[in-house]
Amino acid sequence: MSVAGMRVLIVGGGGREHAIAIGLSRSPSVGSIHTSPGNAGTRSLGVNHDIGPSEIDGLVELAIEIQADLVVIGPEAPLV
Protein backbone atom coordinates (compact mmCIF):
# COMPACT_ATOMS: atom_id res chain seq x y z
CA MET A 1 0.00 0.00 0.00
CA SER A 2 1.27 3.42 -0.91
CA VAL A 3 0.98 5.86 1.98
CA ALA A 4 0.29 8.92 -0.20
CA GLY A 5 -3.38 9.38 -1.00
CA MET A 6 -4.58 7.31 1.95
CA ARG A 7 -8.39 7.07 2.33
CA VAL A 8 -9.43 7.50 5.96
CA LEU A 9 -12.78 6.68 7.56
CA ILE A 10 -13.46 8.34 10.91
CA VAL A 11 -16.36 6.86 12.88
CA GLY A 12 -18.26 9.31 15.10
CA GLY A 13 -19.77 12.75 14.99
CA GLY A 14 -18.47 14.80 17.89
CA GLY A 15 -15.72 17.26 18.62
CA ARG A 16 -13.15 14.51 19.06
CA GLU A 17 -13.79 13.24 15.54
CA HIS A 18 -13.64 16.79 14.19
CA ALA A 19 -10.25 17.31 15.87
CA ILE A 20 -8.99 14.00 14.45
CA ALA A 21 -10.18 15.04 10.98
CA ILE A 22 -8.40 18.40 11.29
CA GLY A 23 -5.15 16.69 12.25
CA LEU A 24 -5.39 14.11 9.50
CA SER A 25 -6.28 16.74 6.89
CA ARG A 26 -2.89 18.35 7.51
CA SER A 27 -1.03 15.17 6.60
CA PRO A 28 0.39 14.91 3.08
CA SER A 29 -0.24 11.15 3.34
CA VAL A 30 -4.03 11.57 3.51
CA GLY A 31 -5.88 11.87 0.22
CA SER A 32 -9.49 11.82 1.44
CA ILE A 33 -11.38 11.87 4.72
CA HIS A 34 -14.77 10.23 5.19
CA THR A 35 -16.65 10.65 8.47
CA SER A 36 -19.67 8.70 9.61
CA PRO A 37 -21.94 10.23 10.68
CA GLY A 38 -19.78 13.32 11.01
CA ASN A 39 -20.92 16.87 11.77
CA ALA A 40 -20.85 20.35 10.24
CA GLY A 41 -17.14 20.72 10.97
CA THR A 42 -16.14 17.41 9.40
CA ARG A 43 -18.26 18.19 6.34
CA SER A 44 -15.84 21.00 5.48
CA LEU A 45 -12.91 18.56 5.59
CA GLY A 46 -14.30 15.65 3.62
CA VAL A 47 -17.42 13.57 3.05
CA ASN A 48 -19.99 12.79 5.75
CA HIS A 49 -21.97 9.54 5.53
CA ASP A 50 -25.29 8.89 7.28
CA ILE A 51 -24.28 5.74 9.18
CA GLY A 52 -24.20 5.75 12.98
CA PRO A 53 -21.29 4.44 15.05
CA SER A 54 -23.34 1.46 16.29
CA GLU A 55 -24.33 0.34 12.76
CA ILE A 56 -21.45 -2.11 12.39
CA ASP A 57 -22.61 -3.81 9.18
CA GLY A 58 -23.17 -0.44 7.50
CA LEU A 59 -19.74 0.80 8.57
CA VAL A 60 -18.07 -2.34 7.23
CA GLU A 61 -19.88 -1.90 3.91
CA LEU A 62 -18.84 1.76 3.79
CA ALA A 63 -15.19 0.95 4.54
CA ILE A 64 -15.19 -1.60 1.73
CA GLU A 65 -17.01 0.77 -0.66
CA ILE A 66 -14.58 3.66 -0.16
CA GLN A 67 -11.62 1.26 0.05
CA ALA A 68 -10.52 2.75 3.37
CA ASP A 69 -6.84 2.38 4.18
CA LEU A 70 -7.36 3.48 7.79
CA VAL A 71 -10.43 3.44 10.04
CA VAL A 72 -10.39 5.55 13.22
CA ILE A 73 -13.05 4.79 15.85
CA GLY A 74 -13.73 7.99 17.79
CA PRO A 75 -16.32 7.09 20.46
CA GLU A 76 -15.66 4.44 23.09
CA ALA A 77 -19.07 2.71 22.89
CA PRO A 78 -18.48 0.78 19.62
CA LEU A 79 -15.23 -0.60 21.06
CA VAL A 80 -16.88 -2.27 24.05
Question: Which residue ranges define each predicted feature?
Answer:
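ATP-binding N-terminal substructure of ATP-dependent carboxylate-amine bond-forming enzymes
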Residues: M1-V80
